[in-house]
């Protein structure tokens, strides 16, 4: 299944790539950018911009700050996750606190999930 992309979000995605949050930068530079499977920053999936996307594993990695824990944020994230998962993409969510306090555990979960998805599914088309 080809994943649609809302091209009106291109400029916003480019800006977000340049202006990563401290937690996104930490995960990117200490782990994701050198991971042996290509992972993209601030990728457009449907009408959403996700923090990180591994196309070959069809995996989204999201880092959640405090706004995600309000009732409105929880509802939005639930809708967003359901729409992304409808494309056959799994969504992993980590809090900023987890990135700060347990980066090794976050990285291990990401690596295990990518490995499991790559060994259990046919190659994805981007």
Predicted regions and their residues:
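Nucleic-acid endo/exonuclease domains
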Residues: 1-126
